[in-house]
Design a protein with these regions (language model features):
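Extended charged/polar low-complexity repeat regions
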Residues: 1-372
């Protein structure tokens, strides 16, 4: 597939804003042609992504979307202001501090209340305000953060370390219980103690950070072993039983031996795919699969030869399932990709409705009865 990324400069966005103001009969707002060259995050050249188009799809060459897959709108200061989905509907909006560029003071999911944020002089969030739900306040002290919700429930986070190695080592929960965590010198989890005082220990590999051993509060241990590609090759449980895995030269799983000794083998017919075309279990039963170029399951044949086929649309969503004896199920979606109907071979249809936020609000059964 080929995609076209539409980029805009600050000068282009400024001119577009001026033209929109003129055509609307309003006074053009202050929209600078350039942005400050440097920010605390590095150099800013003012270039922003405004849209992503699908321009070529070998699976659906004659059925390309007539609109962008996603669009972005920006403020005069180059801050992300709005996000539109593939249906053209606005799904996110952001508001920023007038004084501090890039500091978000409000965020809204379409159809939901606007969440607002307040900050202290150090740029830390002190309040998160939700007009239709729980709001939170944050109080910062050295190695301690107190979080209080609008029902006056309080949690306290105790921290250790500095900058990127700062970790929460103790948490006082609203119900009075306390949990604790321990970390090594590079910030990797070494132990967790629950509210009852029971400690689980973790042993990460010094180089990779992968967990090599877990010891539960009762002293029982599980061990994990990896190859040089960091793939799990063996896992031994507290009972001493072992799970083993083998991989081919491309790193694909080709055999798994369960703790009970049963072996499952995986076969591949495409050197460029990590999706198996067949599996064989310990009884010799064989299952086969076919996949699309995008990794979507197209067919599955079980050990008795029973075939199930799957259809997908250009967005990768499943549109139909075809089983033996002509039994099929069809699925329909709206422009936002939400499931709106499921119909079987006999024409029995179940429909689904959503609100503007994308929440499921009603299910209409084939007999017309409505739930929701």
């Amino acid at each position: 597939r080929h995609f076209r990324l539409v980029l805009t400069t600050q000068a282009q966005r400024a001119e577009e804003a001026r033209q929109q103001a003129i055509s609307g009969g309003t006074e053009p707002s202050a929209f600078p042609d350039t942005l400050p060259g440097y920010t605390e995050y590095g150099r800013d050249n003012g270039i922003r992504l405004s849209a992503v188009w699908l321009t070529h799809d070998p699976e659906y060459p004659e059925n390309l979307p007539a609109a962008p897959l996603v669009r972005y709108g920006w403020t005069p200061r180059g801050e992300l202001a709005v996000v539109y989905d593939r249906s053209g509907k606005q799904v996110r909006s952001f508001t920023y501090d007038d004084k501090y560029r890039g500091r978000m003071v409000a965020h809204r999911h379409t159809g939901r209340p606007e969440i607002r944020y307040r900050y202290d002089s150090d740029g830390r969030v002190t309040e998160q305000l939700n007009p239709a739900g729980l709001s939170y306040t944050y109080q910062y002290e050295k190695d301690r953060i107190t979080i209080t919700d609008s029902l006056d429930r309080r949690e306290v986070l105790h921290t250790q370390g500095e900058a990127g190695l700062k970790r929460v080592v103790k948490k006082e929960h609203a119900d009075g219980s306390v949990t604790q965590s321990q970390f090594d010198a590079v910030g990797r989890l070494r132990a967790q103690t629950d509210a009852a005082g029971r400690t689980t220990e973790y042993s990460p590999d010094v180089v990779t950070g992968l967990i090599t051993r877990i010891t539960t509060p009762d002293g029982r241990a599980s061990a994990f072993y990896y190859n040089h590609h960091n793939q799990l090759t063996s896992a031994t449980g507290p009972d001493g039983l072992e799970l083993r895995r083998e991989y081919d030269e491309l790193g694909r799983l080709i055999q798994e031996t369960a703790p009970d000794g049963d072996i499952t083998r995986y076969r591949y017919d495409n050197p460029h795919s990590d999706l198996p075309c067949a599996t064989e279990d310990a009884t010799g039963s064989r299952k086969t699969m076919t996949w699309s170029r995008y990794g979507q399951l197209l067919s599955f044949t079980d050990c008795s030869g029973y075939v199930t086929r799957y259809d997908h649309d250009r967005f990768g969503q499943m549109t139909a399932v075809h089983r033996e004896e002509g039994l099929s199920q069809y699925r329909a979606y709206d422009s936002r990709g939400q499931l709106i109907a499921v119909k079987d071979t006999q024409g029995h249809e179940t429909r689904y409705e959503y609100n503007i936020a994308g929440d499921l609000t009603a299910v209409i059964a084939p007999d017309g009865s409505r739930n929701g």
